[in-house]
Swiss-Prot record:
Reported function: Reversibly catalyzes the transfer of phosphate between ATP and various phosphogens (e.g. creatine phosphate). Creatine kinase isoenzymes play a central role in energy transduction in tissues with large, fluctuating energy demands, such as skeletal muscle, heart, brain and spermatozoa.
PROSITE patterns per UniProt: PHOSPHAGEN_KINASE (PS00112), PHOSPHAGEN_KINASE_C (PS51510), PHOSPHAGEN_KINASE_N (PS51509)
Name listed for the protein in its UniProt record: Creatine kinase S-type, mitochondrial
Chain positions recorded as ATP binding sites: 162-166, 225, 270, 326, 354-359, 369
Species this chain originates from: Pongo abelii
Similarity-based family: Belongs to the ATP:guanido phosphotransferase family.
């Protein structure tokens, strides 16, 4: 049971208290993190019964709409997290956006770490549906950042044009972007850039505040796939993540632009390792080394990342729980992409395709963004190895089609662990 003082130092209460005490306490994060956050549930009385508030989801096609029932809504509607976040705030983005024509979206977000506990009766089935059977009530997630275990990590660069690995991390004790105050968002930025200043060697770099960039500089970074896009996506706008834009947002990158940190977009931080060409092993090695060093530097300053053994690393959208990892390549496969078996091959290899510029974009010059489907239930090493093995299979298929040979649909990979 958390002490009264530790409860006082949760979320917005902490921000207000620390604001009166000065930034020196905020910088260390010491008081806030002495005890794990306690998901103390409280009730917020409403004027109307739950049935009067229940959203109309009859035309919706997202995970939240499929899992939410009047009974679950009635049970959870009046509950509030210690930071004041409600069920209606969690689901608003899914209510406002019925669904995507090609991708089944999640339809809900978390406002803080406690949301996943307070509203578990909805989050757990949504997670199970989104992650193809991963049940957070009975399963545990594993983490493995040992890049030396990776094999066959060099792609044929005639086909693979670039390689990238990314993840997200959230700072415990501060609300997530849908619910954070301006003070909390600025504190995320402060904690992150103070830690990043300690990076050395090939990881050393500098921070660029979005509010200090010209429109031209921003667009150039976006076009080069270094910077997150402007806040126009329904996920960001309807969930409240675009508030106060561009305050306390920015990008940190090393001098080679191969190791990047996005700050205060969809998550507190997004950690990215990327480079031109097909050396995925080197990209993942840099990713693991940089991520471990960032975590060490943040812990030195009295903070820690949100994590638990049920859900792995805690992020805003349930789709990114677990590793939060997306390993992807830009690969040119003109013949395979036109083969009717292409989608089934991807499905069996646990891979997904996007256009050259990401979701909702076309494949330019037959270049596709290919990445892992899964995020949770497998370790980082396993997911990257799946991408390596799968992309090598796709390239081999492309070569066979070039020679006029037949290709085969591989047997499906098991979803969780080795069978």
């Amino acid at each position: 049971m958390a002490s009264i003082f530790s409860k006082l130092l949760t979320g917005r209460n902490a921000s207000l208290l620390f604001a009166t005490m000065g930034t020196s306490v905020l910088t260390t994060g010491y008081l806030l993190n002495q005890q794990k956050v306690c998901a103390e549930v409280r009730e917020q009385p409403r004027l109307f019964p739950p049935s009067a508030d229940y959203p109309d989801l009859r035309k919706h096609n997202n995970c939240m709409a499929e899992c939410l029932t009047p009974a679950i809504y009635a049970k959870l509607r009046n509950k509030v997290t210690p930071n004041g976040y409600t069920l209606d705030q969690c689901i608003q983005t899914g209510v406002d956006n019925p669904g995507h024509p090609f991708i089944k979206t999640v339809g809900m977000v978390a406002g803080d770490e406690e949301s996943y506990e307070v509203f578990a009766d909805l989050f757990d089935p949504v997670i199970k549906l989104r992650h193809n059977g991963y049940d957070p009530r009975v399963m545990k997630h594993t983490t493995d950042l040992d890049a030396s275990k990776i094999t066959q990590g060099q792609f044929d660069e005639h086909y693979v044009l670039s390689s990238r690995v990314r993840t997200g991390r959230s700072i415990r004790g501060l609300s997530l972007p849908p619910a954070c105050t301006r003070a909390e968002r600025r504190e995320v930025e402060n904690v992150a850039i103070t830690a990043l200043e300690g990076l050395k060697g090939d990881l050393a770099g500098r921070y660029y505040k979005l509010s200090e960039m010209t429109e031209q500089d921003q667009q150039r970074l976006i076009d080069d796939h270094f910077l997150f896009d402007k806040p126009v996506s329904p996920l960001l706008t309807c969930a409240g993540m675009a508030r106060d834009w561009p305050d306390a947002r920015g990008i940190w990158h090393n001098y080679d632009k191969t190791f990047l940190i996005w700050i205060n977009e969809e998550d507190h931080t997004r950690v990215i390792s990327m480079e031109k060409g097909g050396n995925m092993k080197r990209v993942f090695e840099r990713f693991c080394r940089g991520l471990k060093e960032v975590e060490r530097l943040i812990q030195e300053r009295g903070w820690e990342f949100m994590w638990n053994e049920r859900l792995g690393y805690i992020l805003t959208c349930p789709s990114n729980l677990g590793t939060g990892l997306r390993a992807g390549v830009h690969v040119r496969i003109p013949k395979l992409s036109k083969d009717p078996r292409f989608s089934k091959i991807l499905e069996n290899l646990r891979l997904q395709k996007r256009g050259t510029g990401g979701v909702d974009t076309a494949a330019v010059a037959d270049v596709y963004d290919i990445s892992n489907i899964d995020r949770i239930g497998r370790s980082e090493v396993e997911l990257v190895q799946i991408v390596i093995d799968g992309v090598n299979y796709l390239v081999d298929c492309e070569k066979k089609l070039e020679r006029g040979q037949d290709i085969k649909v591989p047997p499906p990979l098991p979803q969780f662990g080795k069978k």
